[in-house]
């Protein structure tokens, strides 16, 4: 019996992507929006999606190579390396292409400190996701070593934001807000908290 193989086809509606982005902006009018386009915009085509989302305040990617491609395609907005940098070569490219860097661990912090590269840095805080980031207890020491010059802000990731019944989201928000209030961070530093679920389901906008 002959097998029939059908090729899967993805139809990308860029107008729909733009519409979705505009919905987020409307629901969070006082906040800046970072459009995450890692993994080739989840298979949608990072460069094309970034061009369509020209109103985004910044773009987030996982790897340096993704950021370089965006820059070389003409994207001028800030580009954030969500997984940070892990060796001197990546750090050098981050400097050349003016990329924002997220710090998750002490090894990354030591890399930046050893090379005096402390500009355009986010500090990731693990408030309950349990995946990446410094603990709440570690963060004050991280900021002390990093210094406040060039600190963009604190970042966390909501674990259950899409579940309106979850109490964990409120707990995570309370933890990072209390942490930020307790730290002597510059007024220019911001909090990056809400993913899409946080905006659409939880109505939380930072």
Feature map (PLM): residue ranges:
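Ordered, amphipathic secondary-structure segments that act as subunit-interaction surfaces
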Residues: 102-104
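A charged N-terminal "starter" segment
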Residues: 1-100, 118
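Active-site loop/helix belt of alpha/beta enzymes
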Residues: 4-6, 39-51, 110, 114-120, ...
